[in-house]
Curated annotation (Swiss-Prot):
<dbReference type="GO" id="GO:0003951">
    <property type="term" value="F:NAD+ kinase activity"/>
</dbReference>
<dbReference type="InterPro" id="IPR016064">
    <property type="entry name" value="NAD/diacylglycerol_kinase_sf"/>
</dbReference>
<dbReference type="GO" id="GO:0046872">
    <property type="term" value="F:metal ion binding"/>
</dbReference>
<dbReference type="InterPro" id="IPR002504">
    <property type="entry name" value="NADK"/>
</dbReference>
<keyword id="KW-0963">Cytoplasm</keyword>
<feature type="active site" description="Proton acceptor">
    <location>
        <position position="72"/>
    </location>
</feature>
<feature type="binding site">
    <location>
        <begin position="187"/>
        <end position="192"/>
    </location>
    <ligand>
        <name>NAD(+)</name>
    </ligand>
</feature>
<feature type="binding site">
    <location>
        <position position="247"/>
    </location>
    <ligand>
        <name>NAD(+)</name>
    </ligand>
</feature>
<dbReference type="GO" id="GO:0051287">
    <property type="term" value="F:NAD binding"/>
</dbReference>
<dbReference type="InterPro" id="IPR017437">
    <property type="entry name" value="ATP-NAD_kinase_PpnK-typ_C"/>
</dbReference>
<protein>
    <recommendedName>
        <fullName>NAD kinase</fullName>
        <ecNumber>2.7.1.23</ecNumber>
    </recommendedName>
</protein>
<dbReference type="GO" id="GO:0006741">
    <property type="term" value="P:NADP biosynthetic process"/>
</dbReference>
<keyword id="KW-0520">NAD</keyword>
<feature type="binding site">
    <location>
        <begin position="146"/>
        <end position="147"/>
    </location>
    <ligand>
        <name>NAD(+)</name>
    </ligand>
</feature>
<dbReference type="Pfam" id="PF20143">
    <property type="entry name" value="NAD_kinase_C"/>
</dbReference>
<dbReference type="GO" id="GO:0005524">
    <property type="term" value="F:ATP binding"/>
</dbReference>
<dbReference type="InterPro" id="IPR017438">
    <property type="entry name" value="ATP-NAD_kinase_N"/>
</dbReference>
């Protein structure tokens, strides 16, 4: 049973305030403690509810259940912060149907009734741990839920780099970049670049090239226990970046080495009891409809 609820909103998004208001009143009626996230709900008028608003690190130490109001981007941001705290997380989608924030405002209250009655499913999802090093010194240490992307910057030129899997040379390529995706991220940027859809329960990572120079360069699926190393060539200096979930960016140079492994912890995603990932795929991708 959950007793301390953390609510996260969309940055500067007053469009989420109506739902946050409903959530606060709902949980207070259920005699639950409600705390808002300072980073995403800084302007929300908490005074009328008599509740706290805490900085994210402090908030994570206080709550046992997280509700994210927004879209998949908002969910990704919170998921990266919550992964070390073993806190279940539920996403309420404000706009279009989401792969991560998959509860609609119309069914939100029914879903929460089920959750508080312990009638729900909880699914563990993997994340990626990213280290960028130069001469043994760590320059960038972050987490990604969907994907880690090596991408050229504004230059029209391709970038060149080598990829290794568990210290074994995989390939050298010229392309616009490389996507390393979790099973969750296989339906994001990776999918639009021609990558496979991977069941979210699999322990795997996919490597998908972005506009490769040679058509023989195909997506590769490797074990989730593998270590991926990206070693850029000289022409990458100042012309390419590593991007986590489309939100965290680090510009790389020729001597930078990027290591990607599975994060040791998991995200615990809360779903309604009748949640069906394949039904969600059909709805998002228009499968089974007449063309």
């Amino acid at each position: 049973m959950f007793n301390k609820i953390g609510i996260f909103g969309k940055y500067s998004g007053i469009q989420s305030w109506d739902l946050i208001d409903k959530l606060i009143l709902y949980f207070q009626k259920k005699k639950k403690t409600v705390i808002l996230d300072q980073r995403s709900c800084a302007d929300f008028p908490i005074e009328r509810y008599g509740i706290e608003r805490l900085e994210r690190d402090a908030l994570m130490k206080e709550i046992d259940f997280a509700v994210v109001v927004g879209g998949d981007g908002t969910f990704l941001d919170v998921a990266r912060c919550i992964v070390d705290y073993n806190i279940p997380i539920l996403g309420v989608n404000l706009g279009r149907l989401g792969f991560l924030a998959d509860v609609s405002p119309d069914t939100m209250m029914v879903t929460l009734d089920e959750v508080l009655a312990d009638d729900y499913t909880c699914e563990e999802r993997t994340l990626l741990h990213v280290l960028i090093k130069k001469d043994g010194e760590t320059l960038f240490d972050e987490v990604a839920f969907n994907d880690v992307v090596l991408h050229k910057n504004d230059s029209p030129r391709m970038i060149e780099f080598e990829t290794f899997v568990d210290n074994r040379f995989l390939n050298s390529q010229r392309s616009d970049g490389l996507i390393i995706a979790t099973p969750t991220g296989s339906t994001a940027y990776s999918l639009s670049a021609g990558g496979p859809i991977v069941d979210p329960g699999l322990n795997a990572m996919t490597l998908v090239s972005i506009n490769p120079h040679t058509m023989s360069n195909r997506p590769v699926v490797v074990s989730g226990d593998s270590e991926i190393l990206i070693r850029p060539h000289d022409n990458c200096s100042g012309t390419a970046s590593i991007i986590c979930d489309g939100q965290l960016t680090f510009q790389i140079e020729a001597k930078h080495e990027t290591y990607v492994t599975r994060h040791p912890n998991f995200i615990k995603m809360v779903h309604p009891k009748n949640h069906d990932h394949y039904e969600l795929l059909r709805a998002k991708l228009n499968w089974g409809q007449k063309l």
